[in-house]
Amino acid sequence: EIMPSLVGSEMCIRDSIWLDLKWIYKEDNDIYTFSGFFSFIVGHIFFISAILQRFAEWDKIIYIVLPVVISLIAAVGMLILEKPLKMNYGKFKVITVVYTFIVALLAFLSGSLALMNGFKIMTLNLMFAGGIFFALSDLILSGTYFGENKKRPIDIITNHTTYYAAQFLIASSLMFLK
């Protein structure tokens, strides 16, 4: 039962490596950015599959369907708000929409299943908190990657703070799997 979560964690580590390499090899920026997106998507899919495998109660399907719908709305909303938020996703538009859906789904699904269980399952609670921190981190990061005039020191500090908090919470959630 723990294997999908471990693979998810490993894929997220790869994401960090790919995205760091884009700063070293600037001429290959796009391939490293796409690789980072892809690794994170795959990692989150493993986290989501682990959550569904372990905690889903298919007779309570609303706790699964509702997070999917909300995540789709978040992804479409991100696309609709590109211009008003002065963002330019360019060639990364499609993968950004997919990425937004998957990251939102991890947060909303773990939160929904935590709610279904009365917030009594620490793995789900920590995964939910970690998912929220990932979403916040990525909102900040999207501004620094795709926004106008959003590479301020405060953005970099808050991005790293929320990102590492997310990593810590999700990794900690594995300790409570039974």
Model-identified regions with their sequence ranges:
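C-terminal ends of transmembrane helices
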Residues: 15-28, 78-94, 142-149
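Helix-coil boundary and interhelical linker segments in multi-pass alpha-helical membrane proteins
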Residues: 46-64, 111-126, 172-178
